[in-house]
């Protein structure tokens, strides 16, 4: 969502569908001579008149991308240098020594992160069969957070997110959904009550195999502020050109998804 680090954007109308939001959100406010696209910002430092003073604090290109992702997911987006950098930021949110439930078929890079954190006694990791909703719900007791990946990469397992989130909330468990394969045009986990969504922008959102980017979309302001602080402190920032290219990819996301689904059904 917009903040005082970035210029104003074209307002998103309540009656726009998701396809229109993907095309129109994040464009600069319109005035005579204004560009239709947010220009690429390549700068390490800024004039100290706002919170945007140094390159780790923000970038106008990120801001436009975060505006689109936040609008599409229904939350507050923070972008990172890769999907795994975004996953690491989420892991940092979990209390030290806390128990994290992770699907057995989660993306290998994510499992590597959690294995390393467990090795250093930062987290306790318990593996779950996310496809089995009953056993997943039974495993919630004693956990601090649950990581769901739906649709899973590459097994294509689909989780019953609403049912699992509903039970997790009763136990005050942090709920995280990697929704990369679904994209926000096919699934919005925050609408199901999840706390946090991960998107590897590298994949469908970027769509052209020419960038590495990740994003964390949070429902609460507190979690969003934590992500901003983590990015500033750890420095896993996206490049301005990468953000620009991701925006370009988002503009065609709807038609690319439609064609992919048509081709899959034909096959």
Enumerate the language-model features and the residues they cover.
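Conserved PLP-enzyme active-site core in the AAT-like
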Residues: 2-14, 24, 28-31, 77-267
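N-terminal "arm"/small-domain region of PLP-dependent enzymes with the aminotransferase-like
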Residues: 2-61, 65-68
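Glycine-rich loop-to-alpha-helix module at the N-terminal edge of alpha/beta enzyme cores
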Residues: 64, 68-72, 78, 85-86
């Amino acid at each position: 969502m917009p903040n005082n680090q970035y210029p104003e954007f074209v307002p998103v109308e309540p009656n726009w569908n998701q396809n229109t939001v993907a095309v129109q959100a994040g464009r600069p406010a319109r005035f005579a001579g204004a560009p239709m696209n947010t220009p690429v910002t390549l700068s390490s430092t800024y004039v100290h008149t706002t919170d945007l003073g140094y390159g780790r604090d923000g970038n106008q290109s990120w801001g436009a991308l975060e505006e689109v992702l936040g609008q599409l997911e229904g939350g507050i987006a923070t972008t990172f240098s890769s999907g795994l950098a975004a996953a690491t930021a989420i892991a940092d949110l979990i209390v030290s020594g806390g128990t994290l439930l992770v699907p057995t078929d989660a993306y290998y890079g994510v499992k590597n992160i959690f294995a390393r954190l467990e090795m250093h006694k930062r987290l306790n990791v318990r593996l779950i069969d996310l496809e089995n909703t009953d056993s997943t719900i039974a495993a919630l007791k004693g956990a601090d957070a649950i990581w769901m990946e739906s649709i899973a990469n590459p097994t294509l397992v689909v989780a019953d997110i609403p049912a699992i989130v509903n039970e997790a909330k009763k136990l005050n468990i942090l709920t995280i959904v990697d929704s990369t394969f679904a994209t926000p045009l096919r699934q919005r986990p925050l609408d199901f009550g999840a706390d946090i969504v991960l998107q590897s922008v590298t994949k469908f959102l970027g769509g052209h195999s020419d960038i590495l980017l990740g994003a964390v979309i949070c429902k609460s302001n507190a979690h969003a502020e934590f992500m901003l602080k983590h990015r500033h402190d750890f420095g896993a920032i996206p490049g301005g050109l990468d953000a620009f290219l991701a925006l370009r990819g988002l503009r065609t996301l709807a038609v690319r998804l439609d064609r992919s689904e048509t081709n899959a059904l034909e096959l």
